[in-house]
């Protein structure tokens, strides 16, 4: 009774998490790029210029610093100003009660912040804008309005003075954000590289050995290739999007460079073609990876719950589903972006248009999770039936846990964990935990899948052992041939005989040849007439001992010995299920 209760409770808990986080996952913007930052700055500039026109047209409008900033940016939690700017609070109070009058510093846009009107002789403080993603949103930017009613200039430079030191703390080496980003980049780069290498070896192994060519391994190969293409597309996208400046250059960004982001875009948009292609390819392979994970779940679920299952018939359907359906979603997204939001590089979220890609991915995750829960339910029920009357419940729970852990990488269950907690700021312990978790599991998932479903597969290990035995025996034969001797095998025994001493053994050869050699043209060497004789260099598969169970033979249990598909007394297990045993062993 314990195992079913555990599985039902787990299903209820995680299903509630999925349902409560549908909108959160789809609406979350995980990454912001340079192009998106430029768009956000230009949008803020347009809003600010609109407000400036209204104020200049109707000077009687009351404009406080707080109300002014709320028009162009979401005000964050205020942080106490430094002692140097103790007059800033008084300036805001005066500004709140004042109207735009003669002698006041005019409101303006400095390509970073929309500044309100300034009181002569006072310091104006505004929150660091949240539309600049990497700013410290708890800090403030400062300007001083001199007694003449004009903004204070930088000495020796015809430029308005402004202090953004609290906003640009992310640009210094004194903060830990730089270390966090470097560590995250290293994690996913190493993870995708290891996954790419291991998956390449796994695909070569499954494709090289003909005895491993079957429907389930074909599906495994498609899944491996989807992980490989996802990793390659991520590397290409990063190279195209983030190759403009290096990390050291980013740390030396100045206010002038931030202001330069709002310059008009170039008239020629051909430079964005490569970026758009890279983003489109990345989104396609990302979607295909999720759908091939779903195909694995559908295939295993079909073997368990369908009495008649034609593997060859469904293989073509699975292939079209895994590679074709994502192409439809991506094609629709490309069409919408090209017609309705053809701006800059297409890595921008562009509002609700991102639902075209994210909703199908979310649907694949939810459906695969439901299949996973259903299979675990059947596994728990089978364990209860096979262990009826036994008192060892620890072993039962151990088998259930082991089988669950094996299935989790295949079904992508780890995607569910942080679906309900999308991050909105690049800060905080929760954000760091979430990012490390996602980067670790997403990048290493391909490696885990290759280990479990290829390198730890019994059939794969048996074929590798056979191939290794053939190669070593052939190499040994060639070495002996060069040294002038031959090696012979008599069943389990091996004899090394010098070529000069080899000759016909009359009595033995004559007595064995009528029974073992059908023709009179038998070799003069008596070794050819002995039972079990195999000469090195000509080893056949039948001469080697069996290295593992064949697909149709009975094993000790399915799903790592859990006994999910152990037949009842007098019951013959379906051949497809017996063949599928090695998938999760």
UniProtKB/Swiss-Prot annotation:
Membrane topology of this protein: Multi-pass membrane protein
Primary localisation category: membrane
SMART domains: HormR
Keyword Cell membrane: yes
Record flagged with keyword Cytoplasm: no
Keywords assigned by UniProt, alphabetized: Cell membrane, Disulfide bond, G-protein coupled receptor, Glycoprotein, Membrane, Receptor, Signal, Transducer, Transmembrane, Transmembrane helix
PTM entry text: N-glycosylated.
Job of this protein: G-protein-coupled receptor for parathyroid hormone (PTH) and for parathyroid hormone-related peptide (PTHLH). Ligand binding causes a conformation change that triggers signaling via guanine nucleotide-binding proteins (G proteins) and modulates the activity of downstream effectors, such as adenylate cyclase (cAMP). PTH1R is coupled to G(s) G alpha proteins and mediates activation of adenylate cyclase activity. PTHLH dissociates from PTH1R more rapidly than PTH; as consequence, the cAMP response induced by PTHLH decays faster than the response induced by PTH.
Name recorded for this polypeptide: Parathyroid hormone/parathyroid hormone-related peptide receptor
């Amino acid at each position: 009774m314990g195992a079913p209760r555990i599985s039902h409770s787990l299903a209820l808990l995680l299903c509630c998490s999925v349902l409560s986080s549908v909108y959160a996952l789809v609406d979350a913007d995980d990454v912001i790029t340079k192009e998106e930052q430029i768009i956000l700055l230009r949008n803020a500039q347009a809003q600010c210029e609109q407000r400036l026109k209204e104020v200049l047209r109707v000077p009687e409008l009351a404009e406080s610093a707080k109300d002014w900033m709320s028009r162009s940016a979401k005000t964050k939690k205020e942080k106490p100003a430094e002692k140097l700017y103790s007059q800033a609070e008084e300036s805001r109070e005066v500004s709140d009660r004042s109207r735009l009058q003669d002698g006041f510093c005019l409101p303006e846009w400095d390509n970073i912040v929309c500044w309100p009107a300034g009181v002569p002789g006072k310091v104006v403080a505004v929150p660091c804008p949240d539309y600049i993603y990497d700013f410290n949103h708890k800090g403030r930017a400062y300007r001083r309005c001199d007694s003449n009613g004009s903004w204070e200039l930088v000495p020796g430079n015809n430029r308005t003075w402004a202090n953004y030191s609290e906003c640009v703390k992310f640009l210094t080496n004194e903060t830990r954000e730089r270390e966090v980003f470097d560590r995250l980049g290293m994690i996913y780069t190493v993870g995708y590289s290891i996954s790419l290498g291991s998956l390449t070896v796994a695909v070569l192994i499954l494709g090289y050995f003909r005895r491993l060519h079957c429907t389930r391994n074909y599906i495994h190969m498609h899944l491996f290739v989807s992980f490989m293409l996802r990793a390659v597309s991520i590397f290409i996208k990063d190279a195209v999007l983030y190759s403009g400046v290096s990390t050291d250059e980013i740390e030396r960004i100045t206010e002038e460079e931030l202001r330069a982001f709002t310059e008009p875009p170039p008239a020629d948009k051909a430079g964005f073609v490569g970026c758009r292609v890279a983003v489109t390819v990345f989104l396609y392979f990302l979607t295909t990876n999720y759908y091939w994970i779903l195909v694995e779940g559908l295939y295993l679920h079909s073997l368990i719950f369908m009495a008649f299952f034609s593997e060859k018939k469904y293989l073509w359907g699975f292939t079209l589903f895994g590679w074709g359906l994502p192409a439809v979603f991506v094609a629709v997204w490309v069409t919408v972006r090209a017609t309705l939001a053809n701006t800059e590089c297409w890595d921008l979220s562009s509002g609700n248009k991102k639902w075209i890609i994210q909703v199908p991915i979310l649907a694949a995750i939810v459906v695969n999770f439901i299949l996973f829960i259903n299979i675990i339910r059947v596994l728990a029920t089978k364990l209860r039936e096979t262990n009826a009357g036994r008192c060892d419940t620890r072993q039962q729970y151990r088998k259930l846990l082991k089988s669950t852990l094996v299935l989790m990488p295949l079904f992508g269950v780890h995607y569910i964990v942080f679906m309900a907690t999308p991050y909105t700021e690049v800060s905080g312990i929760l954000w760091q935990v979430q990012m490390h978790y996602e980067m670790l599991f997403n990048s290493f998932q391909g490696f885990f899948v290759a280990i479990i479903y290829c390198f730890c597969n019994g059939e794969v290990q048996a074929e590798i052992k056979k191939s290794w035995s053939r190669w070593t025996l052939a190499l040994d034969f060639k070495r002996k041939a060069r040294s002038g001797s031959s090696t012979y095998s008599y069943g389990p025994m091996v004899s090394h005989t010098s070529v000069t001493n080899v000759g016909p053994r009359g009595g033995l050869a004559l007595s064995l040849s009528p029974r073992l050699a059908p023709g009179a043209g038998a070799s003069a060497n008596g070794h050819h007439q002995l039972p079990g004789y195999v000469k090195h260099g000509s080893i056949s598969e039948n001469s080697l001992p069996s290295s593992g169970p064949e697909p149709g033979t009975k094993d000790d249990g399915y799903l790592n010995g859990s006994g999910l598909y152990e037949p009842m007394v007098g019951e013959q297990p379906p051949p497809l299920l017996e063949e599928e045993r090695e998938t999760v062993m």
